[in-house]
Amino acid sequence: MTTFYTVISWLMVFGYWLLIAGVTLRILMKRRAVPSAMAWLLVIYILPLFGIVAYLSFGELHLGKRRAERAKAMWPSTARWLSELKESQRIFATDYSEVARPLFQLCDRRQGIDGVKGNQLQLLTTTDATLKALIRDIELARHNIEMVFYIWQPGGLVDQVAESLMAAARRGVHCRLMLDSAGSLQFFRSPYPGMMRNAGIEVVEALKVNLFRVFLRRMDLRQHRKVVLIDNYIAYTGSMNMVDPRYFKQDAGVGQWIDLMARMEGPVASTMGIVYACDWEIETGKRILPPPPDVNIMPFEQESGHTIQVIASGPGFPEEMIHQALLTAVYSAREQLIMTTPYFVPSDDLLHAICTAALRGVEVSIIVPRDNDSTMVRWASRSFFSELLEAGVRIYQFEDGLLHTKSVLVDGQLSLVGTVNLDMRSLWLNFEITLVIDDDGFGSDLACVQDDYIARSQLLNAAEWQKRPFWHRIVERLFYFFSPLL
């Protein structure tokens, strides 16, 4: 009997080390970024069983077998749609500013579609303005409304949006609503899903959180886009979730959330529509390709509208597209670079690009919230400040709420606005969307918004920063080591 237990014990020890060795080899064979690989190996060696479970759950990009098959199956029809769209040569821009040209070339080569012109674009700088404009557009909708959001939380003006959407469905407008399962947990626990379905709205819970499937799909892969499409002509996107900040996370101690949204009219709605169609097919298996833009009702003269490129990321989309776009934008800067983000945990490549821009004389400013709703991200962000300050980057800490805007402005001409945070999750994992706008007029509007943020911020003093407590530095470095996992 003793021999039997001895054999069992040795088999368990052998299996234990074999499992660790197997996961280690798997991490090394994935050719992931070195900091990310090292962070995962550290977790596995310090807390082996927890680390292995965590890695298998969150360490690899598992979309799930069914969704992966749908993503693969949808591309032939999507490619045909893009090919047909490219035949409408009049909607595509052919002339770009010097600072924007490299980024638009990258997007064309990697996504197979160039920037579209003839769009009317409006910045909405407050949640009230956005929700009221959206309600008006929903009330005027005639054919179809598509929405996708990470968070939909009932309360305040959001309830008016819901009522307008249900009224639109009742009068015959085809309405689709896709919400992330984790982000919109309160919505799915409320009466609204049933009310909306009864009104005729197709409501989809995207990427359902299911602990029984934890090893079959990565649970922290989230649908992070915020998009509204109306009648294949009007489109919204930006940083705002479907929440009224007066009712959202009031107990978080960070103040009201500050967001920025863009409202567009024109052919860009079709290019955003194909992104929505892909998301819908991946989640439901149903194909809903949008119609091509109506070339008879759009102003195509370059002077009459904005040139916009849509960048989409996530499983099934070109890998590292958002990351490469940001790097290209930063390296294109010659005079000024202003970046706004609520969560600043950049990749090494992006950090070095930002510092290099400052070192070659570009005026670089980063605007982040002073208080953050994520303690881990707040400490991890602070770990990058010393290197940025040494390079000459100006860091502004916003003091009038949680600044949730995600924007980049390069030389007052090239603008990026969308859902992408400057952190690993947005850069490598989630379903995200970003607009690229080549227009100095829009750049001026965005600069005014950023100037307002700066006026409500405190400039971080490099000398004072060096005087922070020693224990702060220890905590910062600890979270810095795990920043590739955040």
Swiss-Prot record:
Species for this entry: Serratia proteamaculans (strain 568)
Name recorded for this polypeptide: Cardiolipin synthase A
Function: Catalyzes the reversible phosphatidyl group transfer from one phosphatidylglycerol molecule to another to form cardiolipin (CL) (diphosphatidylglycerol) and glycerol.
Main location group: membrane
GO MF entries: cardiolipin synthase activity
UniProt record similarity statement: Belongs to the phospholipase D family. Cardiolipin synthase subfamily. ClsA sub-subfamily.
Keyword Lipid metabolism: yes
Swiss-Prot/TrEMBL catalytic activity: 2 a 1,2-diacyl-sn-glycero-3-phospho-(1'-sn-glycerol) = a cardiolipin + glycerol
